[in-house]
Amino acid sequence: MAISDSSYNELAKQVYNVEPSKAKSNGDLVIVAGKTVKDPITKRQYRVLLVQDNNNDAHKTNDNGMQAMAVAPIVKGDIDTSQVVIAYAGTNAADSRDLDTDWQLLIRGNQDDLVSGNIDGGNFVIAENQLRSAQKFYQQVKRKYPHSALTTTGHSLGAYLALIVAAE
């Protein structure tokens, strides 16, 4: 069964809830692997297979603000990993790393590492850019589910990441 436009849209909305503070501000539960998310229009359910939240990663080099999740539809009670959707979160205006990514990656076209903070004052962090993190997450999903048809979705910055990753 094909994944509907409304499901892609809902997954692109739900991926923001991978980040705990965003889930809290949305009044939702944090999305973790094993959770089920639902498209309210089609009533189709999806099992969350993998998540990545680079806002809460222990490795500072990953601290770039990228969030993503991989889901598979639940068909007749079974998880159908023949098709997996990777959803990327878009810009969170309250997250300076997302705003820095928008500036560096989308506006300036700079695909080098992400530089966040006060560069002139010497108080800055260099982290992998979100596009590289998105590509790595895609490869991780592809390795774990090698026989799956992978598709991507996202809004805003997440749509950019989804389009570039899918085009590669």
What are these model-derived regions, one by one?
Residues 13-14, 18:
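Substrate-binding/charge-relay-adjacent region of secreted/lumenal peptidase catalytic domains
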